Amino acid sequence: MFKYIGDIVKGTGTQLRSLVMIFGHGFRKRDTLQYPEEPVYLAPRYRGRIVLTRDPDGEERCVACNLCAVACPVGCISLQKAETEDGRWYPDFFRINFSRCIFCGLCEEACPTTAIQLTPDFEMAEFKRQDLVYEKEDLLISGPGKNPDYNFYRVAGMAIAGKPKGAAQNEAEPINVKSLLP
């Protein structure tokens, strides 16, 4: 009999403690954000959607060197090189399968022209998996991205309309890397 009364007192105490705890949490600041109305805080170096940028002249920065595809641990990047009449390389097609991408950022680190960059955009939900395969037209943005003044061909040098490398306007003289060796 005393055991039965002890169980009732113990159960009532547990219920009262739970009610006090719930009542106390009702006046605290909410941890949950109302997502669409309140934007989510993202870290400054958050790695989200991948984009292809343009150089300051408005041309594609990508030179189809294939380093991003080689660096990708899951193999979600595919591209094919083409060449313009003046010898400039560009990707004939550039494709990223975001259903396989792990957003590790290795492609961005491998890119010598800073053409491929990760943005803080994370809203990429789709109903069909095929819609997560982005082509070059979907990835290209109108601006230069994180490095607005960098132009790969000004740094690397390229013969333009009969001029030798380094003789064009705003182009630095090419550096002989063998002269830099110790």
From Swiss-Prot:
It is found in: Cell inner membrane. [4Fe-4S] cluster 2 binds at C72, C101, C104, C107. GO terms for cellular component: plasma membrane. The gene is nuoI. This is NADH-quinone oxidoreductase subunit I. It is an enzyme of class 7 (translocase). Residues 52-82, 92-121 form the 4Fe-4S ferredoxin-type domain. The keyword Endoplasmic reticulum does not apply. It is a peripheral membrane protein. GO terms for biological process: aerobic respiration. Its cofactor is [4Fe-4S] cluster. Its main location: membrane. [4Fe-4S] cluster 1 binds at C62, C65, C68, C111. It holds the Pfam family Fer4_7. Belongs to the complex I 23 kDa subunit family. Keywords: 4Fe-4S, Cell inner membrane, Cell membrane, Iron, Iron-sulfur, Membrane, Metal-binding, NAD, Quinone, Repeat, Translocase, Ubiquinone.
